[in-house]
Amino acid sequence: MNPEDLSVLIKNTAAAVLTEHELDASVLPETVTVERPRNPEHGDYATNLALQVAKKAGAQPRELAQWLADALAGNDAIDEASIAGPGFLNIRLAAAAQGAIVAQVLNAGADFGSNTTYQGKKINLEFVSANPTGPIHLGGTRWAAVGDSLGRVLEASGAEVTREYYFNDHGGQIDRFARSLVAAAKGEPTPEDGYGGGYIKEIAQGVLEQNPGALDGSDAEVQEAFRSAGVEMMFAQIKESLHEFGVDFDVYFHENSLFESGAVEKSIQKLKDNGKLYEAEGAWWLKSTEYGDDKDRVVIKSDGNAAYIAGDIAYVADKFDRGHDLAIYMLGADHHGYIARLRASAQALGYDPDAVEVLIGQMVNLVRDGKAVKMSKRAGTVITLDDLVEAIGVDGARYSLVRSSVDSSLDIDLGLWASQSADNPVYYVQYGHARICSILRKAAELGFDTAALADAPLDLLTHDKEGDLIRTLGEFPEVVATAATLREPHRIARYAEELAAVFHRFYDQCQVLPKAGEETEPIHSARLALASATRQVMSNALTTVGVSAPEKM
């Protein structure tokens, strides 16, 4: 019995006892909260339900708690239910009910942890969306790791997720990129507002190799030749870097398509027709202050050209017109102002503003030997995704970026994350997984049927450390659901670290396999089943954050 099952049992029991005493059962919460008590001696789980609803129902807290304890004591899954303090209820599970969690994990396999929180929901998840003017920097790398992991968490919670990359190929930054390429191809200095770094020279050379006559023609023709070919080459490199990082997108959405298809013009006309725009100072303004923005936004500038927000307006409309129920934008620390304007744009167009979510990620800093690492050899300016992977590997890079909340800035110690020690969190978890795989291989050599461990006598698992490990396994589905609801995939990584620690404590005190010359006992099969279930959940957790689960290390 996992916490979710226990929550349902307690709620059903509470409804029955309240009805039996002719009291109002409608005061019960939708979900009863059950927690692990700080002191394990108090039981396996605890709930404050009686304190929460007794007075509303017309009873005293301890009185209701006693009714619950008496009723629960008659359930085969409950070994003991006792009252503490003003009405807390402590619960100890029967050994068979506790062991059933192990069988549940083994039978569910890779699906253990999945839930239906977002069943039937279509979610558009936009992340990275770096300009195609240079390699992905550390901020974009953080979003690549966190965004892909969040997509996995949402999918594990039943959602249909579209991973989307917004390709910014419309605007002045592309012109500056093209001018930088032309200058590099001619051997001239980088323009004052241009892009520098070795990658510019590489792409410029690539354009010339592809089109030896790229520098021939008028200035406009040369600019366009380097613009189109250069952007294509740069974006191909970005895609390759992301793919090697384990991140692929379902949709690469081109900003230019919004203008070329008439979507921008259509959205603006809709806003005009509905009275959501007004003309002032020769420009057209969105009445965004009516929807919580701090100021109205220019949509059409006085020169007749569309402002940047015009593309945003058409893009949010496109996302919902494609049938998405929720649009999540993952943006950098300098995009706080986008939250209100995106929600305002959606509401002005007639969509639910609460269906627009903006997650803001903070900066990432690299440290080596206590000193900041600031320069990329290739980019010439900032550290890139490829630099980080080269330093600590894909698994180290992804895990280091996903294990912390994006609300705070992050320092990555390259020496720590490259080390093969228990101080390295990803190594610690992966080592735990590999260690269990080694145990299972040894068990097979000893004649254990490792494919039938769900049938082991799991009610023999009564040691304190066995109980700690089983209860930790049982928490995984709730951790996944919470990570999805709060958009916090770092909870999965932290859980994996806790699970590894709890397993190591179990393994230190509970002999899993018989020693040489010892007879095989039923407890060995039960503990082997527990170890196998732990391996499965470790694998599921690592997979959910996009990190490998090696069988050997």
UniProtKB/Swiss-Prot annotation:
The top EC class is: ligase
Q: Where in the cell is it found?
A: Cytoplasm
- Enzyme Commission no: 6.1.1.19
GO BP terms: arginyl-tRNA aminoacylation
Q: Which GO terms describe its molecular function?
A: arginine-tRNA ligase activity; ATP binding
Q: Which reaction does it catalyse?
A: tRNA(Arg) + L-arginine + ATP = L-arginyl-tRNA(Arg) + AMP + diphosphate
* One Pfam family it belongs to: DALR_1
Q: Which Gene3D superfamilies match?
A: Arginyl tRNA synthetase N-terminal domain (3.30.1360.70), HUPs (3.40.50.620), Isoleucyl-tRNA Synthetase, Domain 1 (1.10.730.10)
Q: Which UniProt keywords apply?
A: Aminoacyl-tRNA synthetase, ATP-binding, Cytoplasm, Ligase, Nucleotide-binding, Protein biosynthesis
Write down the InterPro entries for this protein, in alphabetical order: aa-tRNA-synth_I_CS (IPR001412), Arg-tRNA-ligase (IPR001278), Arg-tRNA-synth_N (IPR005148), Arg-tRNA-synth_N_sf (IPR036695), ArgRS_core (IPR035684), DALR_anticod-bd (IPR008909), Rossmann-like_a/b/a_fold (IPR014729), tRNAsynth_Ia_anticodon-bd (IPR009080)
Position of sequence motif 'HIGH' region: 130-140
Q: According to its record, what are the GO cellular component terms?
A: cytoplasm
Q: How does it assemble?
A: Monomer.
Entry's family note: Belongs to the class-I aminoacyl-tRNA synthetase family.
Designated name of the protein:
Arginine--tRNA ligase
Name the species this protein comes from: Corynebacterium aurimucosum (strain ATCC 700975 / DSM 44827 / CIP 107346 / CN-1)
Q: Which gene encodes it?
A: argS
